[in-house]
Amino acid sequence: MSSNQAEGLIIAAHGRHYTVELADGSLRQCFPRGKKNGPAVGDRVRITPQGRDEGAIEAVLPRRNLLFRSDEMRVKQFAANVDQLLIVVAVEPTFADDLTGRSLAGAWSADIEPVIVLNKIDLPNGLDAARARLEPLRRLGVPVIELSAQDHAMVHERLAPRLAGRTSLLLGQSGMGKSTLLNTLVPHAQAATREYSAALDMGRHTTTSTRLYHLPEPGGDLIDSPGFQAFGLQHLNGEQILRGFPEFAPHIEHCRFYNCTHRHEPGCGVLAALQAGQIDAGRYALYLRILDENAAARPY
């Protein structure tokens, strides 16, 4: 690294420009050189400072992982160097099982640990139904943390210890209470957003961008992303899709054919496990939907 360069952490992304936090806590609005794939929130980068508060991103430092989601048109980077994915669902309104399952598959395919946060447990009428819908995921070993985001003591008792010293990405459909949870965990979140906006003259764009916040004691980082209603996985190949369904793994070794797709082949260990009730039918149906979508998708 040359003497006029510095290393920093990307704490926000707004299209093709990024907010980079340097070691001294100062912020710079930076732009990547060239048109290759850009960095993501959570990336550590090397920049060349320019002017009072700008800079050019020269390189992205090696990352542990990178989480994507995609649609028919393009692949979108979520965040890099993530330790765990917090998927926020709620007792009310009804959450989408399909979206939850896709988020889990995206996390597992990127070697990121998923955690489900069941919010609004103070609404008892739908609690049993929500628990029942999450039970197949509990059986897979996915941690489910139940809380009410409006109960600060409960959040700090049940969730905060899991965040300490880790980088967590917060995802959730609109209406699940993700913003309330963020403001409970990071009391200065709204103030920080206004500060970044003023310092970098970002205006309204900051409200819809992915952003990293530093958690108060006992520490850790929390990445918040805008509410989403779709989580496409068209960027995954067949092997990566299977990593998103770890419960298939013990049965794949019993497949008769090495290139089995687990859809219709004779002697398929996964289909046998499905028929025996060892694989959840809803999860298997999601696997088929993802395969069909990816087969129909246009290449990027």
Swiss-Prot record:
Signal peptide: none
The keyword Metal-binding is annotated on this UniProt entry: yes
Protein name: Small ribosomal subunit biogenesis GTPase RsgA
Major place of residence: cytoplasm
NCBIfam families per record: ribosome small subunit-dependent GTPase A (TIGR00157)
Cofactor binding note from Swiss-Prot or TrEMBL: Binds 1 zinc ion per subunit.
GO process terms (BP): ribosomal small subunit biogenesis
GO molecular function: GTP binding; GTPase activity; metal ion binding; rRNA binding
InterPro entries recorded: G_CP_dom, NA-bd_OB-fold, P-loop_NTPase, Ribosome_biogen_GTPase_RsgA, RsgA_GTPase_dom, RsgA_N
CDD domains attached to this UniProt entry: S1_YloQ_GTPase, YjeQ_EngC
The entry's keywords: Cytoplasm, GTP-binding, Hydrolase, Metal-binding, Nucleotide-binding, Ribosome biogenesis, RNA-binding, rRNA-binding, Zinc
Pfam families attached to this UniProt entry: RsgA_GTPase (PF03193)
E.C. number(s) listed in UniProt: 3.6.1.-
Compartments reported by the entry: Cytoplasm
Cellular component terms (Gene Ontology): cytoplasm
Domain CP-type G residue range list: 69-231
Subunit structure as annotated in this protein's UniProt entry: Monomer. Associates with 30S ribosomal subunit, binds 16S rRNA.
Cofactor(s) annotated in UniProt: Zn(2+)
Binding site for GTP: 119-122, 172-180
Family from the record: Belongs to the TRAFAC class YlqF/YawG GTPase family. RsgA subfamily.
